From Swiss-Prot:
Source species: Homo sapiens
Record carries keyword Kinase: no
Encoding gene, per UniProt annotation: POLK
Assembly and binders: Interacts with REV1. Interacts with PCNA.
Transmembrane intervals: none
Protein name: DNA polymerase kappa
Residue intervals of the UmuC domain: 103-358
A single BP term in Gene Ontology: error-prone translesion synthesis
pH behavior: Optimum pH is 6.5-7.5.
Cofactor(s) the record lists: Mg(2+); Mn(2+)
Domain notes: The catalytic core consists of fingers, palm and thumb subdomains, but the fingers and thumb subdomains are much smaller than in high-fidelity polymerases; residues from five sequence motifs of the Y-family cluster around an active site cleft that can accommodate DNA and nucleotide substrates with relaxed geometric constraints, with consequently higher rates of misincorporation and low processivity.
Keyword check for Kinase: no
HAMAP family attached to this UniProt entry: DNApol_IV (MF_01113)
């Protein structure tokens, strides 16, 4: 009977510890905790919050019970082994101790409440809190004497202090004041780390070094009267102190009374300032030590905002945070930068004072008899066996007085969210409406930061304080309110349907977006063929703009680039080089080039014409984007009809002129350089020249029409016979190879289907056909313009190009290589048929024909556009 009663009393004490007052905050020393906790328990008993706290307390007690059982099973041998391991780690930490930095933690005193009291002087001597009846953000020091503190429900605070005035928050005003404070902090450390609106870390080590050589004039500031305008520039006028400032400011300067100048001392004040009756010529000269620098910071903050700040000075961030709470409000504390001073400070420090140790960890450590940091160090071996590696590492850092000395500012954001707490909402319409509001607010925040994400998460807390999070990841990034709400609505609908027929009773809802693409993802993200063509088009435009300023010898040739580059980088490089050939052709054959200008130049002229036509008040003169001819004042329907006609019959002669120009340019450059070209016919030849860098590019099926359909076979035979001596033997390879673009008298540009030639050049330009990009679609593999605007047919062509190597192997097995068909131009329909045949056939035996240095083919030989762009 007695044991049951003792157990009940112990459980009640544990609940009081969890739900009772946490007095580890400035201004709450010496309070009657028993009386305050009794009021808190009476105000919450029977509520859902009380029931939720009971459930959490049971969970914590269960964890402690499991921990004590684990402790009982630890042997002395395990303890000795753990002791050696922890001591070895402690020795490493001790050797890495860094005492060379001076870290300052600035914390504004009761920031939100202080701003409200400044703007409404009637509140100065009254207990006030900022927040609502549901939750308080902060309280002033008058209210703290009654036990009212931040993170306390307003209705409980009213029980503790009936005369408490609760002021609604005004975050725009708080942000404006915070900006003023941060402007001052940036003068001492441009890379300071802001933790919130009222809290920041500074590393003033560099400032202290520079300050040693500063004259007094640079360290002098004047004390102002009630004006909140700060005297940033030393040597300017000052006004009289207000009564409030007189009661605060002198405390800052007790250690340096000789620095205060008596009234009437000119001290670099000009004649007008001396004769101004509003000026009280009190100036303060701050020293060069860390203490003096922090006094100066706090003085400037007070002069500019009329608000006070507390500060901690220490060798690392952990100690500086604890020090700033030591002499609150309006005070500062320093730990000298030596090991003995650090250990003396840590010795009797309660573990709850350290940031990162909350009420649950405090209770678990208390069950092991650990209350101070000294006891934390004494039990280090036991803690390493009972807690996770991350936890006991952190405990050991605390017990040795170690912390971070590196301030990281504006790290990469991982997510952005918005959430609201409210009274119970159980109607689906209201829940959807609230979700839409949250999505709109989140979209605005994303727009300000210029962020987009792929994962949308909703957070729901029901009336029983049970929290659920549901997430959905989409393939493309989203950022608008409509896109986010479309995803969040489905997630919310799933939860509503899960509770049907009972309503979903919520008291909190939040929406979060994450999975932001990083810089590397944004750089290489290619999701569609259109996107690929646009990217290539932009690359060509950039090349055209910078080509005149760049020496031709400084260009990086495609065959000399690194093998490690991606396929898209290689293709862009080839297209850039092809465009460079076209530009050189303009210098060599200026007259002939005028009749066939490069596409980008024509496009530029077209854009200029469009801009002129848009600004015209008369009828618009439209230009065809295909033939680039002005169409006069015609309707959009007529222009569309004309564009369709142009797309059905492109100018082949112009295309051939561009090709011929590119070939002539490349030939002349090679003649100038007199660099011999050697064919890559054997592997030994490649190994004999290891310094030569090569890039292979596929020579896929061209699928282009010739001018005269009746001369297809003859043109192919002519090409094959003319260059049979120049080309190497066909090498079966998965790598991509670059083939010569030959000048042909029949004005036919075609590539053989079955022959994959490999080609190498030593430090010379490759022959590349002119790549024409723009309105028409160009295959990203073979760089051949397709005479179709149908994306389905275009995709079929790309599939055929991607599967060329499989088609070749299949055809070599089924047919005699000597009697291969000579037609190089096939319709897209037949290409589709070949593609289907390839996807139905697996030829694992063909892998043995490849060199061991080649990449192993996956089990599924089917190449799709989705895989290609991944």
């Amino acid at each position: 009977m007695d044991s049951t009663k003792e157990k009940c009393d112990s459980y009640k004490d544990d609940l009081l510890l969890r739900m009772g007052l946490n007095d580890n905050k400035a201004g709450m020393e010496g309070l009657d905790k028993e009386k305050i906790n009794k009021i808190i328990m009476e105000a919450t008993k029977g509520s859902r919050f009380y029931g939720n706290e009971l459930k959490k307390e049971k969970q914590v007690n269960q964890r402690i019970e499991n921990m004590m059982q684990q402790k009982a099973q630890i042997t002395s041998q395990q303890l000795r082994k753990a002791q050696l391991q922890v001591d070895r780690f402690a020795m490493e930490l001790e050797q890495s101790r860094n005492l060379s930095n001076t870290i300052v933690h600035i914390d504004m005193d009761a920031f939100y409440a202080a701003v409200e009291m400044r703007d409404n002087p009637e509140l100065k001597d009254k207990p006030i809190a900022v927040g609502s009846m549901s939750m308080l953000s902060t309280s002033n020091y008058h209210a703290r004497r009654f036990g009212v503190r931040a993170a306390m429900p307003g209705f409980i605070a009213k029980r503790l202090c009936p005369q408490l005035i609760i002021v609604p928050p005004n975050f725009d005003k708080y942000r404006a004041v915070s900006k003023e404070v941060k402007e001052i902090l940036a003068d001492y450390d441009p890379n300071f780390m802001a933790m919130s609106l009222d809290e920041a870390y500074l590393n003033i080590t560099k400032h202290l070094e520079e300050r040693q050589n500063w004259p007094e004039d640079k360290r002098r500031y004047f004390i102002k009267m009630g004006s909140s305008v700060e005297n940033d520039n030393p040597g300017k006028e000052v006004n009289k102190l207000s009564e409030h400032e007189r009661s605060i400011s002198p405390l800052l300067f007790e250690e340096s009374p000789s620095d205060v100048q008596p009234p009437g001392d000119p001290f670099q004040v000009n004649f007008e300032e001396q004769n101004n009756p509003q000026i009280l010529q009190n100036s303060v000269v701050f020293g060069t030590s860390a203490q003096e620098v922090v006094k100066e910071i706090r003085f400037r903050i007070e002069q500019k905002t009329t608000l006070t700040a507390s500060a901690g000075i220490a060798p690392n961030t952990m100690l500086a945070k604890v020090c700033s709470d030591k002499n609150k409000p309006n005070g500062q504390y320093q730990i000298l930068p030596n090991r003995q001073a650090v250990m003396d400070f840590i010795k009797d420090l309660p573990i709850r004072k350290v940031s990162g140790i909350g009420k649950v960890t405090e209770k678990m450590l208390k069950a092991l008899g650990i209350i101070t940091c000294t006891e934390l160090y004494q039990q280090r071996a036991l803690l390493s066996l009972l807690f996770s590696e991350t936890s006991w590492h952190y405990f050991l850092h605390i017990s040795l007085g170690l912390g971070s000395t590196h301030l990281t500012r504006d790290g990469e954001r991982k997510s952005m969210s918005v959430e609201r707490t409210f009274s119970e909402i159980n109607k689906a319409e209201e829940q959807y409406s609230l979700c839409q509001e949250l999505c709109s607010e989140l979209a605005q925040d994303l727009q300000k930061e210029r962020l987009k994400g792929r994962t949308v998460t909703i957070k729901l807390k029901n009336v029983n304080f049970e929290v659920k999070t549901r997430a959905s990841t989409v393939s493309s990034v989203v950022s608008t309110a409509e896109e986010i709400f479309a995803i969040a609505k489905e997630l919310l609908k799933t939860e509503i349907d899960a509770d049907f027929p009972h309503p979903l009773r919520l008291r909190l809802m939040g929406v979060r977006i994450s999975s932001f693409p990083n810089e590397e993802d944004r750089k290489h993200q290619q999701r569609s063929i259109i996107g690929f063509l646009q990217a290539g088009n932009q690359a060509l435009s950039a090349t055209e703009c910078t080509l005149e300023k760049t020496d031709k010898d400084k260009f990086v040739k495609p065959l000399e680039m690194s093998h490690k580059k991606s396929f898209f980088d290689k293709k862009r490089s080839e297209r850039k080089w092809s465009h460079q050939d076209t530009f050189k052709c303009e210098a060599v054959n200026k007259q002939s080039f005028q009749t066939s200008q490069p596409f980008q130049v024509l496009k530029k002229k077209m854009n200029e014409n469009l801009e002129i036509s848009e600004n015209s008040d008369d009828c618009q003169i439209l230009t065809c984007p295909v033939c680039f001819r002005a169409q006069g004042c015609i309707s959009l329907e007529a222009l569309n009809k004309h564009v369709d006609e142009c797309l059905d019959g492109p100018s082949i002669s112009e295309n051939f002129k561009m090709f011929s120009c590119s070939h002539v340019s490349a030939t002349k450059v090679n003649k100038k350089e007199n660099v011999p070209a050697s064919s890559l016919c054997e592997k030994q030849d490649y190994e004999a020249h290891p310094k030569i860098k090569e890039i292979s590019s596929v020579d896929c099926i061209a699928l282009v029409d010739t001018i005269d359909n009746s001369s297809k076979a003859e043109s192919i035979d002519a090409l094959s016979n003319k260059h049979s001596k120049e080309e190497c033997s066909s090498l079966p390879s998965k790598s991509f190879n670059i083939e010569h673009c030959h000048q042909n008298s029949s004005s036919t540009v075609s590539l053989e289907n079955e022959d994959v030639g490999s080609f190498r050049q030593e430090y010379r330009q490759p022959y590349l056909c002119e790549v024409k990009t723009g309105q028409a679609l160009v295959c990203p593999v073979c760089n051949v313009e397709q005479k179709t605007s149908d994306l389905t047919l275009f995709n079929v062509h790309v599939d055929v190009c991607l599967n060329k190597s499989f088609i070749q192997e299949l055809r070599k097995d089924k047919f005699n290589p000597v009697n291969q068909p000579k037609e190089s131009s096939r319709s897209t329909g037949s290409s589709s048929g070949v593609q289907k045949a390839v996807t139905r056939t697996k030829r694992p035996g063909l892998m043995t024909k490849y060199s061991t240095s080649k990449k192993i083919k996956p089990n599924n030989p089917k190449h799709t556009l989705d895989i290609f762009f991944k």
